[in-house]
């Protein structure tokens, strides 16, 4: 506050400029003291008289151009807090933060005469006891963090959970997992060349069986292989394939039977030369004959009924024709009779 009350030599009022620079004085421009001192021959610039008393003004030729000896009022010492801490730039560039030891910011020693009240006020507001200093972090690499995981800095952000392991490489073909007993797998692998998968089957009670992304087409179709997704069921095996692998079918006792086996169980195999087959065929033939005879009888009955209805219709038509002829003759008779007979017949 003393700096505002007591005039600083930098802010002392200068002698009034010539009339050419009067507009600059109104716009709050001041002349630099060192430039005016050079203009007056190395002596200090004389103090300007009050505004009501006009004083001598230096000539225009001694001051030179306008831009060299003029400057605006600088309010930066009053607006920028002197004690505000400055955060240092990060030292290392990497992926994680590491707390760096912060050195205390040097506080300039303020004298009693030139102590700035506004600077002290701003320093209390922005960098004082009410504001906490922001943490300063450097960077540390992930490799160094993984190597020295146990001896981390107290301020370092350690991950809450360990990073997940990298995913396994994707398989080339889609596989549908299936399980089968390990002893069956061992039996199959014993006869096959290269028992690489036998070790896997020996370690587990059930070995993993994979259906590849293609399946065999039934023998009736016109192709050998057909691609299908893993969600589609496997194709129906042909009878030749079912007979080719009896040992494998015996191993899969817990699995559902093949559709061909279900059909064979449902349909009995009967010898055509046996008496039972002959009796059954005779019974079937008799039943077919009876049904055919019944159909013929129904057909004959229908035809007979149609004939009866046709004859009745003809009789009715003949009767209608007869009645119509009678009506016409009676009408003609009534037309030929004289009027007196008609009048007498009317009275009767």
Curated annotation (Swiss-Prot):
Glycyl lysine isopeptide (Lys-Gly) (interchain with G-Cter in SUMO) cross-link, chain position(s): 174
Cross-link (Glycyl lysine isopeptide (Lys-Gly) (interchain with G-Cter in SUMO2)): 133, 174, 185, 187, 263, 265, 335
Motif 9aaTAD per record, residues: 116-124
Keyword Hydrolase in record: no
Superkingdom per UniProt: Eukaryota
Name the UniProt record assigns to this protein: CCAAT/enhancer-binding protein beta
Residue numbers carrying Phosphothreonine: 227, 236, 269
Subunit structure: Binds DNA as a homodimer and as a heterodimer. Interacts with ATF4. Binds DNA as a heterodimer with ATF4. Interacts with MYB; within the complex, MYB and CEBPB bind to different promoter regions. Can form stable heterodimers with CEBPA, CEBPD and CEBPG. Interacts with SIX1. Interacts with TRIM28 and PTGES2. Interacts with PRDM16. Interacts with CCDC85B. Forms a complex with THOC5. Interacts with ZNF638; this interaction increases transcriptional activation. Interacts with CIDEA and CIDEC; these interactions increase transcriptional activation of a subset of CEBPB downstream target genes.
Molecular function GO terms recorded: DNA binding; DNA-binding transcription factor activity, RNA polymerase II-specific; DNA-binding transcription repressor activity, RNA polymerase II-specific; protein homodimerization activity; RNA polymerase II cis-regulatory region sequence-specific DNA binding
Region (Disordered): 44-65, 79-112, 158-178, 219-277
């Amino acid at each position: 506050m003393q700096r505002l009350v007591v005039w600083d030599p930098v802010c002392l009022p200068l002698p009034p400029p010539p009339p050419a620079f009067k507009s600059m004085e109104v716009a709050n421009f001041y002349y630099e003291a060192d430039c005016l001192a050079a203009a007056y021959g190395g002596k200090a610039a004389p103090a300007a008289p009050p505004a009501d008393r006009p004083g001598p003004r230096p000539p225009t030729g001694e001051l030179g151009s306008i831009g060299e000896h003029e400057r605006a009022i600088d309010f930066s010492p009053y607006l920028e807090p002197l004690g505000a801490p400055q955060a240092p730039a990060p030292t290392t560039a990497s992926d994680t933060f590491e707390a760096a030891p912060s050195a205390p910011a040097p506080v300039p020693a303020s004298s009693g005469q030139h102590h700035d009240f506004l600077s002290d006020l701003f320093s209390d507001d922005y960098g004082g006891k009410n504001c906490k200093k922001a943490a300063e972090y450097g960077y540390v690499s992930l490799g160094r963090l993984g190597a020295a995981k146990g001896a981390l800095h107290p301020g370092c952000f350690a991950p809450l959970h360990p990073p997940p392991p990298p995913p396994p490489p994707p398989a080339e073909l889609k596989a549908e997992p299936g399980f089968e007993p390990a002893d069956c797998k061992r039996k199959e692998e014993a006869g096959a060349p290269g028992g690489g998968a036998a070790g896997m089957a020996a370690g587990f009670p059930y070995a993993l069986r994979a259906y590849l992304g293609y399946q065999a087409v039934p023998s009736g179709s016109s192709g050998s292989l057909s691609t299908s997704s893993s969600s589609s069921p496997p194709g129906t095996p042909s009878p030749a394939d079912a007979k080719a692998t009896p040992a494998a079918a015996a191993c899969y006792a817990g699995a559902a039977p093949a559709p061909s086996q279900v059909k064979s169980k449902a349909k009995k195999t009967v010898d055509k030369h046996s008496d039972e087959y002959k009796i059954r065929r005779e019974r079937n033939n008799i039943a077919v004959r009876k049904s055919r005879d019944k159909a013929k009888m129904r057909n004959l009955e229908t035809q007979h009924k149609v004939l009866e209805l046709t004859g009745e219709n003809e009789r009715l038509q003949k009767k209608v024709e007869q009645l119509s002829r009678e009506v016409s003759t009676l009408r003609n008779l009534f037309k030929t009779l004289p009027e007196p007979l008609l009048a007498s017949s009317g009275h009767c």
